[in-house]
Regions:
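Intrinsic structural disorder/low-complexity segments
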Residues: 6, 84, 156-159
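Small/flexible residues
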Residues: 4-5, 77, 104, 138
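Mid-chain, structured segments of secreted extracytoplasmic proteins
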Residues: 61-104
């Protein structure tokens, strides 16, 4: 009986260990590493490091991502130096469409079944949102244009650079705990 309980306990422990959340990856590189290790692996993929003027725990790099020239901003926790965010800044002149990029990312990473980046009707205004763009069309403004946008009867163009953020939840919590421990 003890042997059966021991075997069951071992299966539960091993199963629990294998079910732990995997760290975020960027270009196949795990973000659960130090800044120097992460930067060296990116250099191996053709990225070059840019000068950094007074931005502690941050590295800037240039390279190619999704077939486009981009600039990366990589941040790490101050004490552990673990990477917790990679921000991908596309060139302002990069020609892309929202739907093409969305399809590319969904093909690579799958759908998380959450509704993002949709037009929404609200009491006072219609709002189109991405992580970085918010358009608010008040009732007092041109309601005809607002209705056309909501009904998808017109196209729109945002003249903003595209920014993608890869955030490792575990390492960002470590960074937050380090900051809180300083106070």
């Amino acid at each position: 009986m003890k042997r059966i309980i021991l075997i069951l306990t071992m299966f539960l422990v091993v199963g629990g260990l294998s079910a732990q959340e995997q760290p975020m990856k960027f270009l196949g590189i795990s973000m659960n590493c130090t800044m120097n290790t992460f930067v060296n692996k990116l250099k191996g993929k053709g990225f070059t490091q840019e000068p950094n003027d007074n931005h502690p725990n941050t590295v800037f790099m240039k390279g190619t991502f999704a077939g486009e020239k981009v600039k990366l901003e990589i941040r790490a926790a101050a004490k552990t130096h673990l990477v917790y965010i990679v921000v991908v800044n596309f060139n302002r002149s990069t020609s892309y469409t929202y739907e093409n990029l969305k399809t590319t990312l969904l093909d690579k990473y799958g759908d998380n079944n959450k509704e993002y980046n949709k037009l929404k009707e609200e009491d006072k205004y219609a709002k189109f949102t991405t992580d970085y763009i918010v358009w608010r069309l008040n009732e007092d403004s041109e309601t005809h244009q607002c209705n056309r946008l909501v009904l998808s009867q017109c196209s729109y163009r945002a003249n903003f650079p595209l920014v993608l953020s890869y955030i490792d939840g575990k390492n960002s919590i470590i960074d937050l705990q380090e900051v809180e421990s300083d106070f």
